[in-house]
Curated annotation (Swiss-Prot):
GO terms for cellular component: chromosome; cytosol. SUPFAM superfamilies: IHF-like DNA-binding proteins. Coiled coil: none annotated. Keywords: DNA recombination, DNA-binding, Plasmid, Transcription, Transcription regulation, Translation regulation. This is Integration host factor subunit beta. The lineage of its organism: Bacteria, Pseudomonadati, Pseudomonadota, Alphaproteobacteria, Hyphomicrobiales. It comes from the Bacteria. Heterodimer of an alpha and a beta chain. NCBIfam families: PRK00199.1. This protein is one of the two subunits of integration host factor, a specific DNA-binding protein that functions in genetic recombination as well as in transcriptional and translational control. The keyword DNA-binding applies. GO terms for molecular function: DNA binding; structural constituent of chromatin. The gene is ihfB.
């Protein structure tokens, strides 16, 4: 699912909302999650999951094209940990109908 499909879904589930309002709502949620992560905060959405920022230390790696050693700088990366409800639903769906296109 891409962002525009999510906006369309929110608009369809809430017929009193115009598509533009649904888009603004989705943008506001995503902007706030991003802002919280930028501030180093943990975003915990009950029964859905948790967004956190993790530190990746600097390390050496290899260029896959030529095998030369390269230095990879440290960085901060977003990480999502799915909540129990999502994990349970995915595992129930897997048992009943397979994983679809995974």
């Amino acid at each position: 699912m891409i962002k525009s499909e999510l906006v369309d879904f929110v608009a369809a589930k809430n017929p009193y909302l115009h598509r533009r309002d649904a888009e603004n709502a989705v943008d506001a949620v995503l902007d706030e999650i991003t802002g919280a992560l930028e501030r180093g905060e943990r975003v915990d959405i009950r029964s859905f999951g948790t967004f956190v920022v993790r530190h990746r230390p600097a390390r050496s790696g290899r260029n896959p094209l030529n095998g030369n050693a390269v230095f990879i700088e440290e960085k901060w990366v977003p990480f999502f940990r799915a909540g129990k409800e999502i994990r349970d639903r995915l595992n129930t769906a897997e048992k009943s109908q397979g994983r679809g296109n995974l």
